[in-house]
């Protein structure tokens, strides 16, 4: 009996492991796995259904079909365990061994493994240094390959067709060896001397100059080193033994009616065995070569189809014309092993049902139908019934439950008490898609859900379904309660703002009760306290909206944890006083003394959480909800068609617009305007008309005339139901009301272009047939868009999760001093996001000083909370360096200081938090809200006039940043740099706005000047680019000859003459190479030099430049020598929404990207080539000049002699992130990508914290490219993991050797996921075949560091509570180590002890 227990205990237990290695299987290894050879293609006997001997289901090889019973039935039962029946040869064992035992097929002729042949780059091809085409010709018996040339003129590896082979035979006889087929390839692979080849390649690479050759050689070298290091032998890529999968993994099931359902693999194996047996027979018969050859080729094709059907040639199809599913198809794709069974499994103890609303529940509860609870908690109920003695056995308990006796319900209620259940709604886009609740038993069949958690689940009650899961173990229940309870998830992990926020009815109710009305019943009364207000309201003596005075007693918590009590009389309304009754102590009355719109309610809950804590907030949120529902019921808000008040002015506005359109039409007819201009004008006109109608409508709706206490008629905010819904933020918006009561306006065609004729009607008036038809256009496009968007957004989320899944907080502080420089985010001159908001929840990397002093006001290492934010804003700090995930130096994972605050909890992030996945979910979840469209800049947008001045919006002090300028005689400054900026700071020194200043801008203010709001501080001409002189002197023309390089023009209007420089192609032959310029000469006639350099001051003039100064004229500093006309930049389509986010994360290079200066120095233009200009930058430090050819059509922002800094824009266009990283570094790249992505989300009103984007960016920057290898084993141009290179460099520097130098590389998220260290994670993401092939050849080890790998091998993930489990496991093993001693050590110790005692 003891044996039996031990046996059951040790079944299939695996020793602990820390890594998984994948490699090539040698023939010996395949034979060692095998339990016998499959010799026949038979499967099972069609009459007896017993497996055939030596067939694909043979019981002798694979084990018995029934538990502990041999095939012929001689031995049955457990007592014969392990006996091998002498009659049928079957071992008596468990039937489940048929899932584990493998067999093999001895192949009559070697066969190349298709993965190593055809998966690009072909590994066999690389090793043999032959093209794939050539190898295929050898393998499929089209050509001979020379294996050993002997003493002949042939070369090893040379291909010979039949003709050449026979010629060679005639010429050389048996002196050489040439064969075809996989044996030839195997021979060649076997003959490769890895060590010798590696040495040869290492010598060859430094001596090669061509880039492509180096690439090819280093690829070969890498592969050879991989083979050498992994212990794989090259010839193992050619199979001589084929393993056979255990039969229960490729089942054959008899169906009714004598037919069988079978796995495709069986068919594929049968073909292989058939062909193999036939080949053996042919070889025994020594058949003609051509027949044998054909059979070998067919065998090769059969094995190819088994391993990866369809990889080469046409896929083999079954009886129903469907391609057969091969081994490779089993593991790849959504239905493959990885994604279907290993990463996502079905769960027991779960149920699903429709959800309905549970307005009476508390936040931590959900309503669970009794029937469902009974089924889910069955085992618990059985146990309880037995424990109580109500049932004697489990069977009896089962009967009781089935009969649904009254005792059962009592027991169920007891079992369920404080046993949380998990509720999940698909699609689970972020972690709030699964939360824990305490179940409350309800009648009926639908699950009841608390209204406040709907936002997190994105649930509504129009037929949504949700799933219930029961956490069984005590640990699971504990985690569900402590971490997943809905009451612990009040804040959104994406932005740290409350997600448990009332919406719709609740908002409407709260808004209604906090509005004020003029001359309502009880206006002007004064109340002693809130209780009195309550009594008077209930008695009906005062209306809800009456303006009254109330004495209130409030306790206000300050930020330091203290509290102040005070009593005051406030002007308020009855409703607000009633609402204050549910507000927790600690908050001031001012938070409710306003109409409670949605934003205000959200702010109130946020403040409540920060000031009084979690518990109070949860209670308060519930109370808010109850109150909101109560008062929205009382309000009786409903919509009737009369609520849509159409403005009287509408007809007049539309008539006027129609008249103007007619006028434009007649202009077009008479040829005064072009089609495009007409279109743009008409669309602008209608847009304006639409705005006017909606303005009139809103002013109509939002005000109503009432008579106040004194009998005077006054305006008050309207109580129109529709207006209240929109104003409170409960439902609808001004844009929607406009369509209902104003006019529908312009419609777009499916391709995005706007239709000229707008819909002038609204929904109250009704649409005509034509108008309805036009509007269907847009509506259908919207539906099609939504469907596409969902799929695209889901795929983006999947890629993000995959790239970031192994990023976990693993230590508290990595000790780095680096970080990102944070400044306020400015767009179009306005501060969109102040500094305070951006640094909230971050750790300061370096001390922050009070501006203008040496006093540290925020020390490094401070976690910035709301209190610090106020402090930073007050001290008018413009920039702060904060720790960031990008600059974190933790090797595996990230440190808590660099991450900062855990947004969902409001304190520093815990060790073990899976911040990568949270970041991916936060960015991916709102993806469905982003638009899919590309914005065509048409209509109004394309004709916004180019900016030509800076007009400040706020008064304040001028600050100039990074601006190179010269001062003109009249005291104005002229900008002579491109990156200059002008900012306006308020009285506290906080920047309010910031503007870019172009080259040549005339600035009428100086640093520190005070300006008033609305004043214009800078001007420039947007249509020309000036060349400004930086010194005074005399103008001298160089190479400017009329008719050859220049022409004079007289302006007809002004009568002034201008000199225009001719384009090179318009010049006569004599002027082609002359470069016209304007030189500055001093009074002594000598050339002047540019200030601070020894470069003569001469300005080369590009084609079409207009020169405005005469030869010999005197000019002063800041004067314009010439103007270069700018053709207005072409309107580019802006990629918006989801595609833009995907482009940024995939790090795609944009078309016609901007050109940046590669080095800092002086610009010059060299000799032009056809269609290209030669740009030369001479560095100031005297190193070699940098040259670049730029197409002529690119408009350049720089001219000869100008100084540029590395990374400055030379030609405009969309930025290329790779250029930014290379030239400006990681922090500039981070700033660019974060801002670009935030712009897309901000447009949709979605808030995401910057650190999530930085977290993904950290993963995209994992790799580096080796620039110089130093004394390391790296090869120049290799891409390596950053951590790997850093570890190696540390080792080298301790040994006083030369370290390798590297540059950072930016990878797109798909590429980064595929190039991760873990092959399990990469294989389960995409391109499974390629990943596994590469991993097997290089003998990769997966150290199971990420989450995905651990899920696949069925372990706890190394994050959250799992991290503690893993570290504890490792610690235990370290402690156990000394106790594990080998026998030889024991013997040695004994001998020593005996010897010493003997002396």
From Swiss-Prot:
It catalyses: RNA(n) + a ribonucleoside 5'-triphosphate = RNA(n+1) + diphosphate. It comes from the Bacteria. It is an enzyme of class 2 (transferase). Its cofactor is Mg(2+); Zn(2+). Binds 1 Mg(2+) ion per subunit. Binds 2 Zn(2+) ions per subunit. GO terms for biological process: DNA-templated transcription. It holds the Pfam family RNA_pol_Rpb1_3. Zn(2+) 2 binds at residues 814, 888, 895, 898. One of its GO terms (cellular component) is DNA-directed RNA polymerase complex. Zn(2+) 1 binds at residues 70, 72, 85, 88. Belongs to the RNA polymerase beta' chain family. DNA-dependent RNA polymerase catalyzes the transcription of DNA into RNA using the four ribonucleoside triphosphates as substrates. The RNAP catalytic core consists of 2 alpha, 1 beta, 1 beta' and 1 omega subunit. When a sigma factor is associated with the core the holoenzyme is formed, which can initiate transcription. This is DNA-directed RNA polymerase subunit beta'.
